[in-house]
Amino acid sequence: SNGYVVGVDVDQNYIGVNGVADGSFAYNPFITSAMKGLTEAVNTALSDIEAGDWSDIAASNGNFGLEDGDYVGLPTDADSWNFETFTTDEYEALKEKIKSGEIAVDNSSDDSTKPTVSEFTTVNYIQ
C-alpha cells in the first residue's frame, strides 16, 4: 500500500487519474512513464524504406535512444509531470547532455553489465 510505480511504453498517468476519479485508487501511484518514441521509430524506418535502405534494417533489431533522436522519453505535459523536485527544464537539460554525448548511457545487454537483483533488493525512498 502507498507504493508508487513508473509506467512503461506510453504515458500511463491516466490510469492513476482515472483510478482516483472512480475510487479505485486513494492516490495516483504513477510517478512518470518510461515512454517509447514509437512514432519516431516508425517514421525513421519508413523513411529508410522510402530511401531504398531496406537492406540496412531488414531482419535486424533496431536500438534507438536519445543519442539517435527522440526515441525514448518521459511525459512532460503538466498533468502528467508528477515529480516534486525535478523540473521539466532539468529533464530537458539532462536529455540534451545525453544527446550530445556528455552523458553516456550503457546500452549493452551483456549479462556482465546488468545489475544483480533478487527478492531481497532494498529500495531506498528519497523524499
Name every feature range the model reports, one short phrase each.
Residues S1-Q127:
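A residue-level marker of the well-folded mature domains of exported/periplasmic proteins
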